[in-house]
From Swiss-Prot:
This is Translation initiation factor IF-1 1. One of its GO terms (molecular function) is translation initiation factor activity. Coiled coil: none annotated. Component of the 30S ribosomal translation pre-initiation complex which assembles on the 30S ribosome in the order IF-2 and IF-3, IF-1 and N-formylmethionyl-tRNA(fMet); mRNA recruitment can occur at any time during PIC assembly. It comes from Methylobacillus flagellatus (strain ATCC 51484 / DSM 6875 / VKM B-1610 / KT). Residues 1-72 form the S1-like domain. GO terms for cellular component: cytosol. It is found in: Cytoplasm. One of the essential components for the initiation of protein synthesis. Stabilizes the binding of IF-2 and IF-3 on the 30S subunit to which N-formylmethionyl-tRNA(fMet) subsequently binds. Helps modulate mRNA selection, yielding the 30S pre-initiation complex (PIC). Upon addition of the 50S ribosomal subunit IF-1, IF-2 and IF-3 are released leaving the mature 70S translation initiation complex. Gene3D superfamilies: Nucleic acid-binding proteins. Belongs to the IF-1 family. Its main location: cytoplasm.
């Protein structure tokens, strides 16, 4: 899938779930299941509840999102 097909949104982590997944509330109010991107895993970037994150979603499954950036 081309990068242009991805939807980027801002959100806030609500809770940690098993297997490095998170419940993320998007700025439009929807709650999705987020998982960490590979580069964030590789560099051991920790995500805690309350963190502001940027997520990337595919138009085919709007209930899951990849966390690609954690704001400071």
């Amino acid at each position: 899938m081309a990068k242009e097909d991805r939807i980027e949104m801002q959100g806030e982590v609500l809770e940690n779930l098993p297997n490095a997944t998170f419940r993320v509330k998007l700025e439009n109010g929807h709650v999705v299941l987020g998982y960490i991107s590979g580069k964030m895993r590789m560099h051991y970037i920790r995500i805690l509840p309350g963190d502001k994150v940027t997520v990337e979603m595919t138009p085919y499954d709007l209930s899951r999102a990849r966390i690609i950036f954690r704001a400071k």
